[in-house]
Amino acid sequence: MFGTGRERMLWIAGALVLLAIMVVFLSAPAWTRHPNIPPQPAMSGMEGMDDMPDMPGMHMEVAAPAPTPEVLAKQLADKRESEFNHHLAGALMILAALFFLAQDRLSSRWPSARYAWAACLLFAGVFLLVFSDTEIWPFGYQSFLYAVTHNPEDAQHKTFAAILVALGVVATLRTSGRLRGWWSAWIFPVLALAGATMLLFHHHGGMHGPDAMQTMVRVQHQHLRFAGAGAGVAVAKGLADTSGKWQPFFNKLWPLFMIALGVMLLMYTE
């Protein structure tokens, strides 16, 4: 199944990298499995306000305590981390699409170039698997299992990363001819559509400040656009791999959807 000795070594190396990542995640110290996460600060002196009857014509608006410099610095770092991850993923999506569109020309000189677009997906998936959500051990104070079972956003990010890795693996196997069954043509589209559907329900926390609500709405709208482009990739890729007459057209169309998705990811802001 894995072809030549060189191909076999590459697959073994990739499997060992993923295994090493999971070993590091799952070997977190005991204290990270039940981290002491401080609750949100209470509003001093306002105890019992919930029990007071409503007063006609009076709207109670209690200002939250001002965040400390440390909290502000952490919020800014999280924002930059999230935006960087989106931008990197976008750049790799664009690069993957361009490699696919140019693969015939490139592979005539460098045969291995036909795997370049799949390698971009693999790299994006592995990077996000490791570096998204740095509150997870070994970068932070939460174990992998605690984070993905207590924070829906973390669980979704790791799922997106796993989907990218799976897309890269499937693309590599089909490009090499190791995966030939008729059903294998649907793996990539189904995975891509699953990722696009998840974006419709993506939980995104950590919004702060007076414009938090507007920021959340803007982020949700961006996710909707990501989902639309991702669905376009899925449908066009499925048709490219299964339709004979229209295959050349859809083989050009689905990378264009991927480029559109990549551009939107590059423009992502919080």
Residue ranges and their predicted role:
Residues 264-270:
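Juxtamembrane boundary at the C-terminal end of a transmembrane helix
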Residues 75, 82-91, 117:
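An N-terminus-focused feature that recognizes amino-terminal "leader" regions
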Residues 124-172, 200-207:
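Membrane-interface helix-loop-helix modules in multi-pass inner-membrane proteins
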Residues 34-83, 134-153, 204-221, 270:
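Membrane-interface interhelical loops and short amphipathic "cap" helices
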Residues 98-115, 135-141, 171-186, 204-213, ...:
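Juxtamembrane membrane-water interface segments of multi-pass membrane proteins
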Residues 14, 114-127, 182-198, 251-263:
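Transmembrane alpha-helical segments of multi-pass membrane proteins
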Residues 1-33:
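Hydrophobic secretory-pathway targeting helix
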Residues 89-99, 122, 156-172, 225-239, ...:
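Hydrophobic cores of alpha-helical transmembrane segments in multi-pass inner/ER membrane proteins
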